[in-house]
Amino acid sequence: PIYYVGWEEWVSLPELNLPALLAKTDTGAETSALHAFNIQTFGKNNEMVRFGINPIDTDERFSVFCSSKILDQRNVTSSNGISEMRYVIETEMTIGNVRKKIPITLTNRENMKYKMIIGRSALEGFQISAEKSFFTEYPQL
C-alpha cells in the first residue's frame, strides 16, 4: 500500500511517551532529528542517554523527560552549514496507521517551529505532498 504524508504531520513516539508531536517532513535530511535539551549519557559505559523535550511548540514550560539506548554518534551538518556531534537513538514512530522503528538524532531545536523533522530514512514507503499538510489525523491519546 501507498501511504501519503504532507509537508507537516502529527507523529507520536510511543516508546518515549510522546503521544503527539508536530513534525515537518524534510527530504534534505537523511536522518530524523528531535529537539532535546539537558542531554546526558548514563549507565555502564555511557550506553544510555536521557534528555528533555518540550513537545508543545507553543508552551516551553511543559517538559517531558525521556531516556533511550544510544545507537550511534554522528557528525551532522545542519542546513545552516554548522556541524555538530549528535547522539542517535532508535525508537518507534507512528504516523497515522503506520508504525516503524527509525533512527533519530538529538539536537537543540528550541528556536525552530518544529520540534521534530522526519528525514528520508523514516519516509521510505511514503508519498510526500509538498502542497498539503496533515494527511493523517491527530494521534489518539
Task: Go through the PLM ranges and name each one.
Residues 1-141:
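Pepsin/retropepsin-fold aspartyl endopeptidases
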